[in-house]
Amino acid sequence: MPEPAKSAPAPKKGSKKAVTKAQKKDGKKRKRSRKESYSVYVYKVLKRVHPDTGISSKAMGIMNSFVNDIFERIAGEASRLAHYNKRSTITSREIQTAVRLLLPGELAKHAVSEGTKAVTKYTSAK
């Protein structure tokens, strides 16, 4: 009776990591590229507002995307305002005006007051 065919030996558990941490020709390990995000800051705000609430990684991804989107909109609008007024520098005034233009009613008022408070705190700490 013929013996059952032997399957190929199973790959070792750590084999995939060895591929990602490949060494360069000069023997140094390749540095992983750092992915910047606002997750640390979103988490800090969440814990300040709702200390007993957590957040999933999917929700954190959505929050990160939201912050990036709002940042780009405000920066774009502030840039346009500076260009219209023939200025080469975006100041807190352009940011404030951009926020007033982009955010609706009460949300804009709160954002402006929080921004003013942050700028005051920053300048007094200098």
Curated annotation (Swiss-Prot):
There is a cross-link at K6, K21 (Glycyl lysine isopeptide (Lys-Gly) (interchain with G-Cter in SUMO2)). The modification N6,N6,N6-trimethyllysine is found at K86. The modification N-acetylproline is found at P2. The keyword Transmembrane does not apply. The keyword rRNA-binding does not apply. The modification ADP-ribosylserine is found at S7. The modification N6-(2-hydroxyisobutyryl)lysine is found at K6, K13, K21, K24, K25, K35, K44, K47, K58, K86, K109, K117, K121. Its main location: nucleus. The modification N6-acetyllysine is found at K6, K12, K13, K16, K17, K21, K24, K86. Coiled coil: none annotated. InterPro entries: Histone-fold, Histone_H2A/H2B/H3, Histone_H2B, HISTONE_H2B_site. One of its GO terms (molecular function) is protein heterodimerization activity. The modification N6-methyllysine is found at K47, K109. It is found in: Nucleus; Chromosome. The modification N6-crotonyllysine is found at K6, K12, K13, K16, K17, K21, K24, K35. The modification N6-glutaryllysine is found at K17, K35, K44, K47, K109, K117, K121. There is a cross-link at K35, K121 (Glycyl lysine isopeptide (Lys-Gly) (interchain with G-Cter in ubiquitin)). The modification N6-succinyllysine is found at K35, K117, K121. GO terms for cellular component: nucleosome; nucleus. Keywords: Acetylation, ADP-ribosylation, Chromosome, DNA-binding, Glycoprotein, Hydroxylation, Isopeptide bond, Methylation, Nucleosome core, Nucleus, Phosphoprotein, Ubl conjugation. The modification Omega-N-methylarginine is found at R87, R93. It comes from the Eukaryota. The modification ADP-ribosyl glutamic acid is found at E3. The nucleosome is a histone octamer containing two molecules each of H2A, H2B, H3 and H4 assembled in one H3-H4 heterotetramer and two H2A-H2B heterodimers. The octamer wraps approximately 147 bp of DNA. Core component of nucleosome. Nucleosomes wrap and compact DNA into chromatin, limiting DNA accessibility to the cellular machineries which require DNA as a template. Histones thereby play a central role in transcription regulation, DNA repair, DNA replication and chromosomal stability. DNA accessibility is regulated via a complex set of post-translational modifications of histones, also called histone code, and nucleosome remodeling. This is Histone H2B type 1-K. It comes from Macaca fascicularis.
